[in-house]
Amino acid sequence: MAAYAPLELPASGALPFTDYARWRLRLSPNGDHTWHYLRTDDEVAAWPQSTYDKYWLGQDVGLPELPPPTNALEAARNGYRFFQKHQTERGHWAGEYGGPMFLLPGLVIGSYVCGMGFKTEERLEMIRYLFNHVNEDGGWGIHIEGPSTVFGTALNYCAARILGLKADHPVAVKARACLHKLGGAVGIPSWGKFWLSILNVYDWEGNHPIPSELWLLPDWVPIHPHRWWIHTRNVYIPMGYLYGVRFKMEENELVSSLRQELYTTNYYSIDWPAQRSNVAAVDLYTPHSAVLEGLYTLLGAYESCALPPLRRAAIRRCYELVVLEDENTDCQDLGPVNKMMNQIVRVHAEGRESAGAKRHLERRHDFMWMGAEGMMMCGTNGSQLWDIGFMAQALIETGLGAEDEFRESALRALQWLDNCQIRENPKHYRTAYRHQTKGAWPFSTKTQGYTVSDCTGEGLKAVLYLQEHVKGAPKLISERRLCDAVDVLLSLQNTDGGFASYELIRAPQWMEWLNPAEVFGNIMTEFNYPECTTSVITALAIFRKHYPHYRTADIQRTITHAVDYLHKAQRPEGGWFGSWGICFTYATQFALESLALVGETYETSAASRRACEFLVSKQRADGGWGESYKACEVIEWVEHKDTQVVQTCWAAMALMYAKYPHPEPIERAVKLVMSRQRPDGSWPQEAIEGVFNKNVAISYPNFKFEFTIWMLGRAHRYLKELHAKK
């Protein structure tokens, strides 16, 4: 395929493969991010690079050194002087959302099998990204900080070869050696088996059945897929279709070469059915249960005699659900995995020239992020709302939002929040098994249209803070719209008082016995999360201060029930386990904030005291905290080799929310964070900050501004008050 011709490449990705002065970030009115390479000098002259372009590309942004801060508030002010220069004209902050190393292969394989190419500059920088994240042994992990796995190495090797990496390039040679040392691609986990089968370099007989017929079951059946966690069901819809039709790339020279390169034995001699449960030990996080293996035996028997009319009806049903998802999200879809699978479904069912296929082609770029290390595939189409929600709250709680210097920036943030609120339920609300969204805020953009309980919570708090505390701020979001957001939050509480992510819990937890993915934990049904629950508690508590007459009894009942859940979720050592950030520092900060808003602090609450003592016990000699992503895997505290600024801020803020009476731990944290601030007000990037499904780390690079500014500004006032009392 001419669009994927082999490329001449340097030995490493240390230097850019393209001219970074020619990259530009374009923003749609709704906040969609797309990177563009300008090939002519006239284009470059007509579209100058912005400060945020240069920053994300790792270029010199040309901002001046600031006066050295003499206290924490001045350090926070310097931090925001830097960060506001990266606020977009739309009012939000752009940023990467990378980290997982199985996303780019889906983009590349999904595009290749659909006959959709990339610009040469995009191909070059995607290869460079892979070069820059290869491990010392030549392989790739499940995320950028993880050890090499078959999943990461086989998929990224295929992606690099498709993009134009030659088989004899030193990076390819070393990657193959790593893969073969791990046993070759036969032991790739199920999602990898699926992608390699799509590429026609792994036989479909090596996959466990993916029965699309499950979608024909009555909705009331306990294992009906609409009850699964939304990311899982939205991936297995197109998976069921593509498995059902046995979609595969036509054989060509590259496919034939990969069949030789990926395996330690002859491709045509492999016993494919014997590979179905073969998962390399280095990849295995969630082994198959005996229940799942028994189910696979039954499904295998069914697959050998599946009724063609039933299979056709099931495939048709999966196609219908794919279209509903695409229409609900304008082909951005829930995330990049189901987005690329949906694209293949639409091309297979409708043809490459169909409107659906063309829209998918355009929407690929919403997930492609250009950074200092090359071009990556993001975990969603951004984290726009998530970032602005925290920054807006930080502006108010530090007092910076009241300063004339930052007022315009705060008002632009409010305008973005106004535009970003989801004003209606999804187009296909009931038929696509969606939860209500009218009044919610998304994680990224309202076009993508999915809300998470904590995103609506943080969005609501941000609006209330800005509209009530910024001088002269207009009431852009009406009381009715704020009440709509509250309605969404109240609709999401589960029976035990906790809040899950996207929806109510629809299936029993024993469904996790049927987790087929091997590399992820807690994916089969929704689970309650302390950090989601706390975001809702704090949002409702702040809302009722300003609007005390709306659903008063419902709000009180919800908060009381949620606090009961939070007490039960506290771990014996005193912290709360974080499922979306790393890890105990993250969740414990949110928990102590919410408890404080209902009157539970260090002086009044045993739970708060235990949490504070837990955090203080983990403070390091340098004054900071450092937690490894490994804590999320093993569900216990694991020290990072280095102190982390972001986690230090979470821990210090937790202590302040709890009204911890001793200043020394907070003073030491402030000193550590200030010591790492650069002269221009910024902080360098440190270790990865986020996580999902226990085993995959993901980046939140704007956290190093949002939480540092927030903590320093709060600490300045808090410490003054503590010392005044003494």
Curated annotation (Swiss-Prot):
The superkingdom listed in its UniProt entry is: Eukaryota
Q: Which Gene3D superfamilies match?
A: 1.50.10.20, 6.20.120.20
Q: Which organism is it from?
A: Ganoderma lucidum
- Pfam families per record: SQHop_cyclase_C, SQHop_cyclase_N
Keywords, in A-Z order: Endoplasmic reticulum, Isomerase, Lipid biosynthesis, Lipid droplet, Lipid metabolism, Membrane, Repeat, Steroid biosynthesis, Steroid metabolism, Sterol biosynthesis, Sterol metabolism
- Give EC number(s), comma-separated: 5.4.99.7
User: What is this protein identified as?
Assistant: Lanosterol synthase
Q: What does this protein do?
A: Lanosterol synthase; part of the third module of ergosterol biosynthesis pathway that includes the late steps of the pathway. The third module or late pathway involves the ergosterol synthesis itself through consecutive reactions that mainly occur in the endoplasmic reticulum (ER) membrane. Firstly, the squalene synthase SQS catalyzes the condensation of 2 farnesyl pyrophosphate moieties to form squalene, which is the precursor of all steroids.
Q: Where is the active site?
A: 454
* Family annotation (InterPro entries): SQ_cyclase_C, SQ_cyclase_N, Squalene_cyclase, Terpenoid_cyclase/PrenylTrfase
Q: Which reaction does it catalyse?
A: (S)-2,3-epoxysqualene = lanosterol
What are the subcellular locations of this protein? Lipid droplet; Endoplasmic reticulum membrane
Q: Which terms in the Gene Ontology molecular function aspect does this entry carry? A: lanosterol synthase activity
